[in-house]
Amino acid sequence: MDIDRNRLRTGLPQVGVQPYRQVHAHSTGNRNSTVQNEADYHWRKDPELGFFSHVVGNFRIMQVGPVNNGSWDVGGGWNAETYAAVELIESHSTKEEFMADYRLYIELLRNLADEAGLPKTLDTDDLAGIKTHEYCTNNQPNNHSDHVDPYPYLASWGISREQFKQDIENGLSAATGWQKNGTGYWYVHSDGSYSKDKFEKINGTWYYFDGSGYMLSDRWKKHTDGNWYYFDQSGEMATGWKKIADKWYYFDVEGAMKTGWVKYKDTWYYLDAKEGAMVSNAFIQSADGTGWYYLKPDGTLADKPEFTVEPDGLITVK
């Protein structure tokens, strides 16, 4: 899984000694925070006020502290058992956003338990395993904490204690196909991967996914091949004629925008050499500069246009 380590803080004090036997599950308690400002604050805060190893939110995982080092994260004796401590932001505005981050949260907690050689169990009587902050508050020696996270926040999005336990122990089934959140759509393959910064043909239709994996829609894209492509509101790549912002464009079967002369169904059209828009009701000079072509109001080439030269030299078309 992708983990951003741009705010990984080194030099934090070691708490306890190895082996560390717990992974701790937290939520931030801040309804306005983002994953980035949580990471930024952790970067500069006094570690004696507490520190943790990871924060999940806004479809990202950021590692902000070391693992296998202990941590001041649960306010008691089990600080010295912390292999990793994971915070989940509490500022989600839609269920789709929450579920995307919840999936990352579960996957990360399980992966960290595997990494530490710990059982993927939640809040059991055994010392080793994944423990919520609430469980630590109620069961650790020398407790000085009153925190009950992450249960209240999970419950606010419909995740019960039983569901959380099941998801920790069994994992979440991989979501496949089209997925949506507040930013846009992406497509998940059967192996859990998704396309980034590339074209992909899905069910016979071509789409383009940006560097973050989101589908382009209602947008132009200049590709590395030098060609321009257009993706409509549904994300489908344009081919053939397409009216965009009241201008007509033509795209070949590969989706590339055409310029210059184009023959379509035995009729010639001219597409602006720079912008690609169809030219209409206008004269276009021949390539050798010896003459002019006339394009009718519908954009088709007039094979035998009739002109009138007005007294002031203005040329009009009959």
Curated annotation (Swiss-Prot):
Q: What Pfam families does the entry give?
A: Choline_bind_1, Choline_bind_3
The entry's keywords: Antimicrobial, Bacteriolytic enzyme, Cell wall biogenesis/degradation, Hydrolase, Repeat, Secreted
What is the protein's major site of localization? secreted
EC code(s) of this entry: 3.5.1.28
Q: Which reaction does it catalyse?
A: Hydrolyzes the link between N-acetylmuramoyl residues and L-amino acid residues in certain cell-wall glycopeptides
Domain N-acetylmuramoyl-L-alanine amidase, residue spans: 19-151
Gene3D superfamilies attached to this UniProt entry: Cholin Binding, Peptidoglycan recognition protein-like
Q: Which CDD domains does this entry report, sorted A to Z?
A: PGRP
Report the GO terms under cellular component: extracellular region
Which SMART domains does this chain map to? Ami_2 (SM00644)
Task: Give start-end of the signal peptide.
Answer: none
Can you cite a GO biological process for this protein? symbiont-mediated cytolysis of host cell
Identify the stretches annotated as Cell wall-binding repeats: 175-194, 196-215, 217-237, 238-257, 258-277, 280-301
Q: Which GO terms describe its molecular function?
A: N-acetylmuramoyl-L-alanine amidase activity
Q: Where in the cell is it found?
A: Secreted
Family per record: Belongs to the N-acetylmuramoyl-L-alanine amidase 2 family.
User: Which protein, by its recorded name, is this?
Assistant: Lytic amidase
Q: Which organism is it from?
A: Streptococcus pneumoniae phage HB-3
The taxonomy runs: Viruses, Duplodnaviria, Heunggongvirae, Uroviricota, Caudoviricetes
